[in-house]
A protein has these predicted regions:
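Alpha/beta-hydrolase active-site loop
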Residues: 108-128
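Catalytic active-site module of serine/aspartate enzymes centered on a nucleophile-bearing elbow/loop
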Residues: 258-286
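Alpha/beta-hydrolase fold nucleophile elbow
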Residues: 129-141
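Conserved alpha/beta-hydrolase "acid-adjacent" motif
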Residues: 224-230
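Conserved alpha/beta-hydrolase
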Residues: 83-105
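Hydrolase active-site cap/lid region
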Residues: 149-206, 254-259
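An N-terminal hydrophobic leader/cap segment in hydrolases
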Residues: 12-44, 51-54, 282
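Short beta-strand/loop motif that positions the catalytic acidic residue
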Residues: 210-211, 216-219, 223
Length: 286
C-alpha cells in the first residue's frame, strides 16, 4: 500500500473505504519487454463493467493455473513481476486489473471488485488451454484480503485448489486504525474507521469458511506497511489445511523476491496439484 499520508488525511477528514484504492491508468511496462509471452484479455463483470487482464501462458505443459490479484496501487503493469516466474514453473497466470485500474473501466469499490474477480475466474476456467479444476487464487496485500473473502463465498469453490495470501491485512478497519495510531497527529482519531470504513468484506470474518480449501499465508518479518501479526490473526482463525510462512529480511510483498521462497512456493503448488480435487465442496460459504 502506498500514499500513507493521503490515507491518514482522508481518514481524518471522514472519508471511507475508497482510500484503500490508489489506481493508475498508466502502462508502465509489459511482460513482452522482458521476453515473457502474454495475451491481453478483455471481458465484462456481471454489472457490465469492462475489465482488462493479462494472460501469461505456461511454458510447455501446464501444471495448473493462477488467478493473480494485485495490491492497492497502480495496476498490473507494476505488479506482474511478482508472478512473472510462474509460467516457467509450469503455471498459466491471469493477472486482473480491478475496475478503475489500468485498462479496466469503472470506479473501484469492494463490492464491484468482488464481481470483477468472479468474472476473471469464469474467464480463466473457460479457456481451452486451462484445466478448470487446477486453479489457485493468489493475492498480495489488498489482493490477498480480496482473495480470502472471494474464495470463501465463490460459486467456483470446487475449481480452486488453494488460496495464497501474501502480506494480506486481516481487517479493513483494523489496518486503518493501526495506521492512524502510528502517527502522533492522528493517534486521537483511531475511532474513525469504526464509522467510516466498510468492513462487510473483511477477510477476518471470512477466513474460517475457506476450509477445506488449503490456505497459505506469507508475510515478511520486516513488513512495515501491513505488520506480520495480520497474517497471524488470519492463521489463527482459519481451519486446516493451513500454513503460515514468515520470511526473514522481507518487507511488504517482498518475500517472492527471494529465489528460495519462489522455489518453496513452486513446490507447495505442485503438492497441492497432486492432492487432487477434494470432495464435498460446498458451492459457497453462507
Amino acid at each position: 500500500m502506498r500514499t500513507l499520508a493521503a490515507l491518514l488525511l482522508a481518514l481524518a477528514l471522514g472519508a471511507c473505504t475508497p482510500v484503500f484504492f490508489q489506481p493508475s491508468s498508466t502502462l508502465y511496462a509489459t511482460p513482452g519487454l522482458y521476453g515473457i509471452d502474454y495475451q491481453p484479455v478483455e471481458f465484462k463483470a456481471k454489472d457490465g463493467t469492462g475489465l482488462f487482464a493479462w494472460y501469461l501462458p505456461a511454458r510447455g505443459h501446464a501444471i495448473g493455473s493462477v488467478l493473480y490479484l494485485h495490491g492497492n496501487a497502480e495496476n498490473i503493469s507494476t505488479h506482474f513481476a511478482n508472478v512473472a516466474w510462474m509460467p516457467a514453473a509450469g503455471y498459466n497466470v491471469l493477472a486482473l486489473d480491478y475496475r478503475g485500474y489500468g485498462g479496466s473501466d469503472g470506479r473501484p469499490t469492494l463490492a464491484g471488485i468482488q464481481m470483477d474477480i468472479d468474472a476473471a475466474m469464469q474467464a480463466l476456467i473457460s479457456r481451452p488451454d486451462v484445466d478448470p479444476n487446477r486453479v489457485v487464487v493468489f493475492g498480495q496485500s489488498l489482493g490477498g484480503a480480496l482473495a480470502i473473502y472471494y474464495v470463501a463465498h465463490s460459486q467456483y469453490r470446487s475449481h480452486i485448489r488453494a488460496v495464497i495470501a501474501d502480506s494480506a491485512f486481516a481487517d479493513y478497519r483494523l489496518v486503518a486504525q493501526e495506521k492512524l495510531a502510528d502517527v502522533p497527529l492522528t493517534w486521537p482519531l483511531q475511532w474513525l474507521p469504526k464509522f467510516t470504513v466498510d468492513n462487510d468484506y473483511s477477510p477476518r470474518a471470512a477466513v474460517a469458511a475457506l476450509a477445506p480449501i488449503p490456505l497459505l499465508l506469507i508475510h515478511g518479518e520486516r513488513d512495515s506497511i501491513v505488520p506480520p501479526h495480520h497474517s497471524q490473526i488470519l492463521y489463527d482463525l482459519a481451519h486446516e489445511p493451513k500454513a503460515l510462512w514468515t520470511i526473514p529480511d522481507a518487507g511488504h510483498i517482498g518475500a517472492l523476491r527471494q529465489a528460495a521462497v519462489r522455489k518453496r512456493l513452486a513446490e507447495y503448488l505442485a503438492q497441492e496439484e497432486q492432492n487432487g480435487v477434494r470432495s464435498n465442496f460446498p458451492t459457497a460459504a453462507r
